[in-house]
Amino acid sequence: MRRPVWFFDLDNTLHDASSHIFPYINDAMTSFVARRLHLDRDEASQVRNRYWQQYGATLLGLVKHHAVDPHDFLYETHRFDELSGSHLNDLSNIVSGEKGLRQLLNRLPGRKILLTNAPRAYAQKVLQELGIVGCFEAVEAIEDMEVHQQWRPKPDHLMIRRLLRKYRCAPHRAVLVDDTLGHLREYSKLGLKTVWFKRHVRTYTHNRSNVSLEVQSIHQLFKSWQKLK
C-alpha cells in the first residue's frame, strides 16, 4: 500500500483513556443528564447508556429528544480543569502514550489525521500532553462532524465520505486505526482499510472479519503496516 492516508482515533488508541478519563467523563455525563432532565442518578445513567446504544453517542440522543445544546454538553462533560484537589485536575497526571510515540508516528509513511468523537479542546490538550501535536496534518473532532445540520460522529457514512473528499483520498487509500470494532466494521463497508488497536480493549470478540490488521501498539503498526493491501 503506497502512501496511505491514516485516520487515527484518540482515546484508547493513542493513549489509555479507560483507567481514569472515561470513568470521569461517564460520571460527568450522568450528572449532566440528571441535572438537565431532572432525574436521579440511576435514571440518568440508564438514559445515558440507552442513547449511547441507540445512537452511538449519548450526545445525539440528548440533541434529538431534549434539544440539548451540543456545545454545552461537551464543555460540561470535559472540564478537567474544574477538578481542583483531584488527581484528574491536570491531564498531565493521567495521560501517557507508549515510549517513542512521536518518533513512530513521524516515521510512519503517509498523511495522518486525527479523527475523534471527542471535543476539539480536549483532543488538543491530550495531543499536547503526548507531545504529538505536530504529527498530524489536521484534527477532525466531533464539532467538525456536522453534515446537513446534523451531528454525525463515527461511524457515520456521510461524515467519512465528506472527509475523504476533503482530503482527496480514495477509500482504498484510507486507513482507520481505532479500538472500536463497530467503527471499523462500518467503514470497511466503504472500502477503507481497518486497523484494530486492541491494547486497551477489555472485551474481545470472535467476529473480526472486517479488520484488515490487528495491533497492540503503534510500534507494532509501524512494523507491520505494509501487510495492508
Segments and roles (model prediction):
Residues M1-R3, N106, P119-K229:
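Asp-based, Mg2+/Mn2+-dependent phosphohydrolase catalytic module
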Residues D16, L114-T116, W196:
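Hydrophobic residues in well-ordered beta-strands that form the structural core
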Residues L39, V68, G110, C169, ...:
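Short glycine/serine/threonine/alanine-rich loop segments
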Residues L74-S92, G100-L130, F136-M145:
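Substrate-recognition element of Asp-dependent hydrolases with the DxDx(T/V) motif
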